[in-house]
């Protein structure tokens, strides 16, 4: 059974070996996320090499995502996890040290220290550990813990009511982007996006490195990102609803409503949407998710999210492969009761991004024709990825087989809802239609006498403008030997 909603897996110590990565791929991974808040270029480079070798060997559109560290406040390295209890105190310092309970822990960036005030609430590791500032000095802050937990290396830290304007991109981010371009990665997830200018500035950096069209995913995780959401969505290629930091920066009870708003608005704007953070969190330790987690994943799918993301579950959890299999099972079961027709009508009515009235008419009419004719799939040839991305926003019941000669587009489409990318060297319409039908049959999407709708481009036309309703049998009747001399 196919799954239209895509799965993103964060790669970490639990999964960064060839054997584990292949198991994740077999379980349903579509995108491998590398979190550049952790690790080095050397360690990420090893993982990237394994992923590239794996996707070539298996001939699959596995995308690789670079997630930037961004302008966040974060703890430094600790010698070993520091266990804390209510009432315990810990010193945070500006100088770089290997942290311990006795010597304290480094806090990055050092520019935040002058802005910290006593009695300010502190949340560590997405709010799992809570503390309060009891002593604030120029290069040192002392905090007192309000609950028990373990302080680990590089964990996120949030200080309430701190008014400091951090730069959107740090020197590390720029170096990481350069590395990502050199490694020919497929997607960039930009952390803590506040406005469309942040996206524009990142595009300029990517352009300076020779990759101006590298897709950028805007992570929405603070109040400015929410406030400026519409302009950010138009500037970015996709949206990630980063619920962890969002639930710290705003009230946690606001997150479900914001999730629904952003999923809907992303779709209407023609942008893919990723729902992230704590989706199957208990599976970091346990072999089964909670009922609430299953409902959380299902509701994200009902909201129309393009992809769901696993973080700690696959990066450092005890059951990474089973977590992916569980996620895929939830997707497949939920999609049985997904109201495709309602989404189709709603998206046409509320579409906020009219790419062109002509293309809108072709796409909308084509999906209607395909559904009324009981077609089993849509096949579309694309060089830029625009046509399948455009069709995906309507959330059609029909799988979209996207045929492309562009390797970057092939991998980039891995994150799009309902899109199944296929790489070809052919521009001959008869040949690529034949290849797409063979691909569909091999993947279990199509059978011999199924009807299909083919989107293609007429001679001299820039946009997709040709719709053909045919059958798999008619396309495959002449063999490739007969088609190609």
Swiss-Prot record:
K(+) binds at residues 35, 37, 67-68. It comes from Chlamydia trachomatis serovar D (strain ATCC VR-885 / DSM 19411 / UW-3/Cx). It comes from the Bacteria. This is Pyruvate kinase. Its EC number is 2.7.1.40. GO terms for cellular component: cytoplasm; cytosol. ATP binds at residues 35-38, 74, 155. GO terms for biological process: glycolytic process. Homotetramer.
């Amino acid at each position: 059974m196919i799954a239209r909603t895509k799965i993103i897996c964060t790669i970490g110590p639990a999964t960064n070996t060839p054997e584990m990565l292949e198991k994740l791929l077999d379980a349903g991974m579509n995108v491998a996320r590398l979190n550049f808040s952790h690790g080095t270029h050397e360690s990420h480079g090893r993982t990237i090499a394994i992923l590239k070798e794996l996707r070539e060997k298996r001939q699959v559109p596995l995308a690789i995502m670079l997630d930037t560290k961004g302008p966040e406040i974060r703890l430094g390295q600790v010698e070993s996890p520091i266990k804390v209890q209510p009432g315990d105190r810990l010193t945070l310092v500006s100088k770089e040290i290997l942290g311990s309970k006795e010597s304290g822990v480094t806090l990055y960036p050092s520019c935040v220290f002058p802005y910290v005030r006593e009695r300010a609430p502190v949340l560590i590791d997405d709010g799992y550990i809570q503390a309060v500032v009891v002593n604030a000095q120029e290069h040192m802050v002392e905090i007192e813990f309000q609950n028990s937990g373990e302080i680990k290396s590089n964990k996120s830290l949030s200080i309430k009511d701190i008014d400091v304007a951090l730069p959107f991109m740090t020197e590390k981010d720029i170096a990481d982007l350069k590395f990502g371009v050199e490694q020919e990665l497929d997607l960039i997830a930009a952390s803590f996006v506040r406005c469309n200018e942040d996206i524009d500035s990142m595009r300029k950096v990517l352009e300076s490195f020779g990759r101006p069209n590298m897709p950028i995913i805007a992570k929405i995780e603070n109040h400015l990102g929410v406030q400026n959401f519409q302009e950010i969505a138009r500037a970015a290629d996709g949206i990630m609803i980063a619920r962890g930091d969002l639930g710290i920066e705003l009230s946690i009870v606001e997150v479900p409503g914001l999730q629904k708003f952003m999923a809907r608005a992303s779709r209407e704007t023609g942008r893919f949407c990723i729902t992230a953070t704590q989706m199957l969190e208990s599976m970091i330790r346990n072999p089964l998710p909670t009922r609430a987690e299953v409902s959380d994943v299902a509701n994200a799918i009902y909201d129309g999210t393009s992809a769901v993301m696993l973080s700690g579950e696959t990066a450092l959890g005890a059951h990474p492969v089973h977590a992916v299999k569980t996620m895929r099972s939830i997707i497949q079961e939920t999609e049985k009761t997904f109201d495709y027709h309602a989404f189709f009508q709603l998206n046409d009515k509320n579409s906020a991004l009219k790419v062109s009235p002509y293309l809108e008419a072709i796409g909308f009419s084509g999906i209607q024709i395909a559904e009324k004719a009981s077609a089993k799939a849509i096949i579309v040839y694309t060089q830029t990825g625009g046509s399948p991305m455009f069709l995906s926003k309507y959330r059609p019941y029909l799988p979209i087989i996207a045929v492309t000669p562009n390797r970057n587009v092939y991998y980039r489409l891995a994150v799009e809802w309902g899109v199944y990318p296929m790489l070809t060297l052919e521009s001959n319409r008869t040949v690529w239609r034949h290849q797409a039908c063979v691909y569909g049959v091999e993947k279990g999407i199509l059978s011999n006498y199924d009807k299909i709708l083919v989107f293609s481009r007429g001679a001299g036309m820039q946009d997709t403008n040709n719709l053909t309703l045919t059958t798999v049998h008619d396309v495959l009747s002449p063999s490739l030997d007969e088609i190609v001399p």
